[in-house]
Regions:
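Charge-rich, low-complexity N-terminal segments
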Residues: 1-48, 86-89, 95
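Long, highly charged amphipathic alpha-helices
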Residues: 13, 17, 75, 79, ...
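Beta-strand-connecting loop/turn residues
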Residues: 34-35, 55-56, 99-101
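Short N-terminal mixed-charge amphipathic segments
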Residues: 38-67
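Short, internal acidic amphipathic alpha-helical interface segments
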Residues: 59-101
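Well-ordered alpha/beta subsegment
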Residues: 89-123, 127-143
Length: 143
């Protein structure tokens, strides 16, 4: 399969490209409801990453932990906004899931991105999520 991006990624073409890539045996992908792909990152403890592809961008995201489990949440929110500069290619957000708010890590890339770039984004998001769950929380607690 070519590394070039198709004219427009679809769920099927994106799943097939991930599966047939050199990393395909380390990323389990499946379709979820709507236009979302669920990727289990095997090298990262089966961390779940969600992918959606639109006309102009591909969004990848993962839930971190419930906001109500974060001590001093207001101070932590300010802390992660300041720490944003040291988290490459990812942005923090808060997502509502079934009435509960979760910290979320998001990456975005052009819909014209080739599969190698998409795979890089998946790896970086997984690494950043693990770092956020441990190192950033520890740095905040120590601060």
């Amino acid at each position: 399969m070519s590394d070039a991006a198709p004219a427009a990624w679809t769920m099927d073409s994106l799943m097939e490209a991930i599966r047939s890539s050199e990393e395909g045996d380390r990323i389990a992908v499946s379709a979820s409801g709507g236009d979302v792909i669920v990727a289990a990152m095997r090298d990262y403890g089966d961390l779940t990453i969600y992918l959606s592809a639109g006309a102009e961008q591909i969004v990848v995201s993962t839930l971190l932990w419930p906001c109500d489990e974060q001590e001093n949440a207001d101070e932590f929110n300010r802390f992660i906004l300041k720490a944003q500069k040291v988290v490459p290619l990812s942005n923090f957000a808060i997502a509502d899931v079934d009435g509960r708010e979760y910290y979320e890590l998001i990456g975005e890339l052009s819909s014209n991105s080739d599969i190698a770039t998409i795979l890089l984004e998946l790896r970086v998001l997984a690494e950043n999520a693990i770092s956020a769950a441990s190192e950033l929380r520890e740095a905040f607690a120590a601060g």
